[in-house]
Amino acid sequence: MPIITLPDGSEKNYESSVTIEKIATDIGPGLAKAALAGRVNGNLLDTCIPITNDAEIQIITSKDNEGLEIIRHSFAHLLGHAVKQLYPEAKMAIGPVIEDGFYYDISYKDTFTPVDLEKIEKRIKELINKDYDVDVEVVSPAKATQVFSERGEVFKLDIIKNIPKDEIIKLYKHEEYIDMCRGPHVPNTRHLRAFKLMKVSGAYWRGDSNNEMLQRIYGTAWKNSKELKEYINRIEEAEKRDHRKLGKKLSLFHFQEEAPGMIFWHPNGWTIYRVLQDFIRETISKYDYQELKSPQIVCRSLWEKSGHWDKFKEDMFTTTSENKEYAIKPMNCPCHVQVFNQGLKSYRDLPIRLSEFGSCHRNEPSGALHGLMRVRNFVQDDGHIFCTNEQIQEEVQSFIDLVFEVYKAFGFNSILIKLSTRPEKRVGSDDVWDKSEKALSDALDSKGLDWSLLPGEGAFYGPKIEFSLKDCLNRVWQCGTIQVDFSMPERLNSSYIDVDGKKQPPVMLHRAILGSFERFIGILIENYSGNLPIWLCPLQIVVMGITDRNNDACLDTKSKLIKYGFRASVDTRNEKVGFKIREHTMQRIPFLIIIGDKEEENNEISVRTREGKDLGKMTLDKFKVIMDESISKKSLVESK
């Protein structure tokens, strides 16, 4: 006789086992129609699974975050249903939920084409319109093995092999199609409406290149057609802003097969890089960082001492010299510890803040490489703070100020903050963890910031704070981090003399603001669609004449602009001025200066912006004031 407690505290008594479907019906027909699943004593459950004991329950609908995930997972099974009807020889592998949608990995003899996707999408819509119930059966691994053996689903059998014999498996039945999943799933296809199949790509079974290459069909699904349309619009806008396309169009960088994951920076792109680096260098100097430079290639022995060799060697590029094995550094931290270790340190010397624009190499899988966002060679705006336990909070507070100062300069005002705390397997005493976690949370609270807690998500060697940016398309990019480390200083024999004259290992704070220069530049390019803030633009001004006889005045103006410290060029081509304006506007040049006979006569210039605004005629001195103000204030253009 289960007693069911609802979210408002009210109770319902039942004579025998009861389902979420029944409870929702008893509450009201509207809720019964909207119910997707239930949260029972904290666990999600299908609407048809019996509840036999007392329970606290919440009815899940599409309005809940869990509801959207259930819809997406159910769409993955519906995709499988459609594929098996159209291509009976296909073998189904896995179909999980991902950000904004779902995918299904499929083995099939022919390559799926855009025409195939259209056919599959059409069949999915037909299945939805049949408005059928999705049935659930709870079985043993042995029974599941029998079911999928009869169907020849080899990938399902491979999954079942690794499931303990005493566990249960849920089989979800879409008419004649059977799939397995933890669930829950929607009770009826009427809940599945707003979706679109997006693309097909390749993926190895279990991510192992020694296994079969499968075809991965991606889809997106939403609560309603309005949200779907908004998402499709965002995707289309993101494609227009793709930093790889703009990088080529604006001649910023390129990649080629001879150096996968390594960037060929063009002069324009390298200018952005250097300006960004100079800005970070200037900003962190106000926070008393000391910049250093550490070796690019370091002997295996140091990586063994630091613990990276055991955990990271597969991702390292290695080489040998004089019978010794070396690694190109994948991170900078062990090298920074070596700098700290030079000479005796007192508690009076702490904190010591070291920084480096450290070039790192990681042997990322070729399939994971993605423009500037995922590369094999990148430069971190890396920093390490050596301090005492008592100094952690103050150092974190200072870093928070630094992070927000930098992000504000680039127009990022929506910052998501997460605090990750101790995992089950960790080093250090509970007392040390208590103090360090409190130091981080107190630092965040002292700044009046909203933040979320991720229990158990910290590294084994200390808690951390992550800072993520939200761009103009509401995409979230994790960039900044500050990580407490109790382990590495001890592993690498770091110490300072405390107030009692005893040796103590310092606390090490790993911190980065941008993450990597390459990825951050990619984020900026996409956020601004190439229309970078004036101070960051590789070329800020182009001067052009209306006729050839104005060329000397243009060249003279360009020379003065360069002397003022601006990045300027001159266009003396024998082309119509309208053509030049259009071309340089397409190149995202912030200011275009036009000089004709009247401008020469009056010692003036005409100025246009890349947004098409005519600023009219003015003296060069007045234009210099506009430029100086824009650059000094780090003026931003609207992200459009």
UniProtKB/Swiss-Prot annotation:
Its cofactor is Zn(2+). PROSITE patterns: AA_TRNA_LIGASE_II, TGS. InterPro entries: aa-tRNA-synt_IIb, aa-tRNA-synth_II, aa-tRNA-synth_II/BPL/LPL, Anticodon-bd, Anticodon-bd_dom_sf, Beta-grasp_dom_sf, TGS, TGS-like. The lineage of its organism: Bacteria, Bacillati, Cyanobacteriota, Cyanophyceae, Synechococcales. One of its GO terms (molecular function) is metal ion binding. Catalyzes the attachment of threonine to tRNA(Thr) in a two-step reaction: L-threonine is first activated by ATP to form Thr-AMP and then transferred to the acceptor end of tRNA(Thr). Also edits incorrectly charged L-seryl-tRNA(Thr). Residues 1-61 form the TGS domain. GO terms for biological process: threonyl-tRNA aminoacylation. Coiled coil: none annotated. Its EC number is 6.1.1.3. Binds 1 zinc ion per subunit. It catalyses: tRNA(Thr) + L-threonine + ATP = L-threonyl-tRNA(Thr) + AMP + diphosphate + H(+). Gene3D superfamilies: 3.10.20.30, 3.30.54.20, Anticodon-binding domain (3.40.50.800), Bira Bifunctional Protein, Domain 2 (3.30.930.10), Threonyl-trna Synthetase, Chain A, domain 2 (3.30.980.10). GO terms for cellular component: cytosol. Zn(2+) binds at residues 333, 384, 510. The gene is thrS. It is found in: Cytoplasm. Keywords: Aminoacyl-tRNA synthetase, ATP-binding, Cytoplasm, Ligase, Metal-binding, Nucleotide-binding, Protein biosynthesis, RNA-binding, tRNA-binding, Zinc. This is Threonine--tRNA ligase. Homodimer. Signal peptide: none annotated. Belongs to the class-II aminoacyl-tRNA synthetase family. Residues 242-533 are annotated as: Catalytic. It comes from Prochlorococcus marinus (strain NATL1A).
